[in-house]
UniProtKB/Swiss-Prot annotation:
This is Uncharacterized protein H233R. Belongs to the asfivirus H233R family. Keywords: Late protein. Induction: Expressed in the late phase of the viral replicative cycle. It comes from African swine fever virus (isolate Tick/South Africa/Pretoriuskop Pr4/1996) (ASFV).
Length: 233
């Protein structure tokens, strides 16, 4: 099964056609079912992916699309393929782009209790009033805290994080490389709209794909696995 979020505008019809044909060919070769979330319109979907099933659920918002983002599109497909899988290490990824209306810390704490190995916090300059508190809580639980910062703001973000807090500050690109070469599966978690933990198990280069999306500042929001699962039965 391939679950695709389709956020495209009608301005990308020519590019859409090329991309959708590629997806359709892959699905047919491997006998995969295609389900598409967030379609521009039903008629639009039927034109490009007539063998697919439309799901009226919002899984991902995507601010824009072009040919440059082809690698990100594949990354998102990989994420959905793995969404409901189980059994992996836990890695918390906290981002201002996906901050819910309630505090994220209860969900983070719950994950730590369940054995999370590390917490990754990208772009701390976007919410510097919260970052020191979260880092301290993570370190208290004797977990690794990796703070991924924008390379253009490395000095500023490092100052915001604060020295001597027991965390590792590195650029997002460096984090991508570090995690991508890992052999052990990692479960990337974030809070859903209710502040509870959801996750995607990834391993190896797939972690790099995911963080590559963050490097391009995609705005990612995911629904709970149970909510998605009920649409897949």
């Amino acid at each position: 099964m391939i679950l695709i979020a389709s956020p495209f505008s009608l301005a990308h019809l020519e590019y859409l056609h090329t991309w959708h044909v590629t997806i359709k060919n892959i699905a047919q070769q491997h006998g995969l079912d295609i389900k598409v979330a967030i379609v521009v319109s039903t008629s639009h979907l039927n034109t490009f992916l007539p063998i697919s099933t439309a799901l009226n659920i919002e899984c991902i918002t995507f601010p824009g699309c072009g040919i440059k983002e082809i690698d990100l599109l594949w990354a998102r497909i990989k994420l959905f393929q793995h969404y409901c899988a189980i059994g992996a290490r836990l890695l918390w990824l906290v981002s201002a782009d996906i901050r819910p209306p309630v505090s994220t810390w209860p969900a983070i704490a719950d994950s730590l209790k369940k054995g999370a190995d590390a917490v990754v916090i990208p772009y701390p300059s976007r919410w510097n009033n919260l970052i020191p508190t979260v880092i301290k809580e993570i370190v208290v639980h004797q977990k690794k805290c990796l703070v991924a910062v924008d390379a253009r703001h490395l000095d500023t973000d490092t100052q915001i994080v604060g020295a001597g807090m027991g965390c590792i500050v590195l650029t997002l690109k460096a984090l991508m490389v570090r995690l991508s070469i890992g052999k052990q599966p990692i479960k990337i978690l974030w809070p859903d709209l209710h502040g509870t933990a959801e996750g995607i198990p990834l391993e190896g280069v797939e972690v790099g794909w995911f963080l590559n999306a963050y490097a391009h500042k995609l705005n990612i929001r995911c629904l709970g696995a149970d909510h998605i699962a009920q649409h897949l039965t």
